[in-house]
Amino acid sequence: MGDLARVGKSIRHCFIKDNGVRFYGQLLKPPMSQTRTSSFFNPRRILKVDRNQNVNNGDVFQLLDGEWGLCFDNTEGYYRDAIYRTFGVIIMDKEMKWQRRKVEIDPLTKMEKTVGYEDLGMLKCAMEFTAYTDDSLKVPQPRYRLVCGKNILPGDLLDDEITVNHVERVVGVNLAYLRGKVLGKAYQS
């Protein structure tokens, strides 16, 4: 009888993470039971890797067609012992300038004040418009939802116009809620 740990090794591919580390795995379409019409982001895939591969939730890697994918917690496959791990993959279709607010304490008021922004590079993410909500002056403000593998924080600035409102850690990735200008050039590819 064949060893189940070797099944699929002949059809696996080499992928490269955004930090340059290589790993081997298979990229599969999810079963119909895992696809819903209420999916929030672009079509998902399933990444199946050997149990010893160095792949974790939140890892970003390049797909075979040149796009980037983000791994999130899915499940493991067992036959007496763990033989493989699977991750859900969200296609990262946006790359945005990412900045973090620099603060200092005002000596007079003893309150925090923003003294500039620290550039954190480019943030690969998937993002979608959710709704317009009114601010205190009844001016409609667009709201967005973003998913990424980086440690973004409330108050971070994306593309000089979008502010991170709230961040939650869900299935091993960061889900952020944003507010900002209507995104034309920044949101469109």
Report residues per predicted region:
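Hydrophobic, proline/glycine-rich low-complexity stretches
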Residues: M1-N19
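Short, conserved turn/kink motifs that form compact alpha/beta structural patches or helix kinks used as
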Residues: N19-S189
